[in-house]
Amino acid sequence: MRTNPTTSSPVVSTLEEKNLGRIAQIIGPVLDVVFPPGKMPNIYNALVVEGRDTVGQQINVTCEVQQLLGNNRVRAVAMSATDGLMRGMEVIDTGAPLSVPVGGATLGRIFNVLGEPVDNLGPVDTRTTSPIHRSAPAFIQLDTKLSIFETGIKVVDLLAPYRRGGKIGLFGGAGVGKTVLIMELINNIAKAHGGVSVFGGVGERTREGNDLYMEMKESGVINEKNIAESKVALVYGQMNEPPGARMRVGLTALTMAEYFRDVNEQDVLLFIDNIFRFVQAGSEVSALLGRMPSAVGYQPTLSTEMGSLQERITSTKEGSITSIQAVYVPADDLTDPAPATTFAHLDATTVLSRVLAAKGIYPAVDPLDSTSTMLQPRIVGEEHYETAQRVKQTSQRYKELQDIIAILGLDELSEEDRLTVARARKIERFLSQPFFVAEVFTGSPGKYVGLAETIRGFQLILSGELDGLPEQAFYLVGNIDEATAKAMNLEVESKLKK
């Protein structure tokens, strides 16, 4: 789908015929504005409040029209703090939705929801802008061919492979490693595929946003010496922002990604951390707008809001957007309406397990809960499919035997079951992997493991060729050759101790 980005002078030119209203009511981030009869703005139009507060400080607040109330009043949601606003202040209707800069000028820079740079590196070329509200590509423009997107992370590539141009969800509670996994994916994809990425930080910690930026500069994903050669654009609407900004920042990031897909005809990666915060912000705004809450206090328009964002993330004949979204699961409950609604849109799910994280298995991806529509013999091939199924069967059998082991001990198991448990424990450890972005914490260098190497490694474990090796040799290594080398080192160390 071709975008029609506007190539024009700055927004000021659209304000020549100013359509002015006045603030009638302020409730937190929600403003009611009165306009003259016949001059009502459209839904989603951007309104600008300019002036000075009681202390004489300059105010410049952008809002978005959400409701037409009647009696020439509209209700709008502010995209920044409403401190200092007063009733009676003038409001300018810009006559258009929020528009943000797009194209090469966005690479290597950090933006807020309005498309304004917030990294103190000077202004951005805003000659090419695009509105954040657009319809999804028409059915006839979609591209339907299926291909795997290799990530270099063993557990992902083997058991829940990602689809090129698909939508992937990272599910997990607080502190199990969603953001670290996203950072590793950005790192691997920039280095292995040379693709352009757009990162949307939606309602997450400002510290994490800053850490990610520094990490990208260190790893060369953002090129400080020549910003234009950077591989990623960052859009942040963090926890401290009003709900309006957190609700729309995902659309700002998506608009930038769509331009790379439709006009530059590139394959783009869109990271959203965290899609739950998008729903949460929508819930806050919905309550402020006076809508009746739905299940568990969520907004009644939850499915519609999610659909309007997710349906724009797709592959067209021009290019693709592959989206990887972190999904916070409230109280680890996958049946909560927010994660449950997200599930419906995904091609693959990577579920992070607190039990594995507690064991020190990182990435803590649950091999049994994680799924992918791509894991079919006709797509990935018989060898990959068979290996993945056998890994899952072995892990499932180990899970079933854990109660018996806890009560009676390993000795009460049959010979066959003991062998299954030993292999399952090796598989569990071999599914861990040292990350490039976690080198600082783990002290071991990161590893990128190709799909062929991953399949070979698990086939060797399942065949029984490596039954003699200790299970700790498989922990936090790259390919299977490193595991055998580590086993030899462990043997040498144990002999020296004796």
Swiss-Prot record:
Entries under CDD domains matching the protein: ATP-synt_F1_beta_C, ATP-synt_F1_beta_N, F1-ATPase_beta_CD
Gene3D superfamilies associated with the record: 2.40.10.170, Bovine Mitochondrial F1-atpase, Atp Synthase Beta Chain, Chain D, domain 3, P-loop containing nucleotide triphosphate hydrolases
SMART domains in the record: AAA (SM00382)
InterPro entries in alphabetical order: AAA+_ATPase (IPR003593), ATP-synt_VA_C (IPR055190), ATP_synth_F1_bsu (IPR005722), ATPase_a/bsu_AS (IPR020003), ATPase_alpha/beta_chains (IPR050053), ATPase_F1/V1/A1_a/bsu_N (IPR004100), ATPase_F1/V1/A1_a/bsu_N_sf (IPR036121), ATPase_F1/V1/A1_a/bsu_nucl-bd (IPR000194)
EC number(s) from the headed UniProt entry: 7.1.2.2
Record Pfam families: ATP-synt_ab, ATP-synt_ab_N, ATP-synt_VA_C
Catalyses which reaction(s): ATP + H2O + 4 H(+)(in) = ADP + phosphate + 5 H(+)(out)
GO molecular function: ATP binding; ATP hydrolysis activity; proton-transporting ATP synthase activity, rotational mechanism
Record's keyword terms, sorted: ATP synthesis, ATP-binding, CF(1), Chloroplast, Hydrogen ion transport, Ion transport, Membrane, Nucleotide-binding, Plastid, Thylakoid, Translocase, Transport
Annotated family: Belongs to the ATPase alpha/beta chains family.
PANTHER family found in the cross-reference section: ATP SYNTHASE (PTHR15184), ATP SYNTHASE SUBUNIT BETA, MITOCHONDRIAL (PTHR15184:SF71)
The protein's name in its UniProt record: ATP synthase subunit beta, chloroplastic
UniProt source species: Salacca zalacca (Snake palm)
